[in-house]
Amino acid sequence: MTDWLEHSVQIEVAAPIDLVWSLWSDLEQMPQWMKWIESVEVLKDNPDLSKWKLASGNFEFSWLSRIEKIVTNQIIQWESVDGLPNRGAIRFYDRHGSSIVKLTVAYGVPGWLIKIMDNLFLGRIVESTLMADLERFRDYVIAIEQKEKEGN
């Protein structure tokens, strides 16, 4: 039996929504700011599907994910269809010159593992990792925006 655990984090990015959206929606670039994501490959014959590989230390997980909903500058929602069970959404909120990015991730954990591990401990690790990912994304966006300004 699998139990689902869900975590949400958000951050404000001092950049316009169009830039924030365009950088996040380029899924294959995610390993640049998500340290546990080793690779993302969008399938050429079906761009709604992508292969993901998560690796850290001695463990590695992979899964195939399908985009369930996409609304430009607002939301990308996904669910795994094979491999590591997970689902979630990334939401974007326009703050007229800045953007709020909210990431919600849910993942399936075997019930026996929940009993062994402290759910709160696991949750704190996941949320701190996701928050660090959003902070790296914010820094990535700011660096790209700065390069664009210097190029003009």
Whereabouts are the PLM-identified features?
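Hydrophobic ligand-binding cavity/cleft-lining segments
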Residues: M1-D45, D139, N152
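Hydrophobic-ligand-binding modules of eukaryotic lipid transfer/binding families
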Residues: M1-E12, W52, S98, M131, ...
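Hydrophobic pocket/interface hotspot
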Residues: V20-W24, M30, S50-W52, I67, ...
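Short, cysteine-centered beta-strand-loop-beta hairpins and adjacent loop/turn segments enriched
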Residues: A55-S62, V109-L113
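Beta-strand/loop substructures that line and gate deep hydrophobic ligand-binding cavities in soluble
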Residues: S80-A132, D139, E148-N152
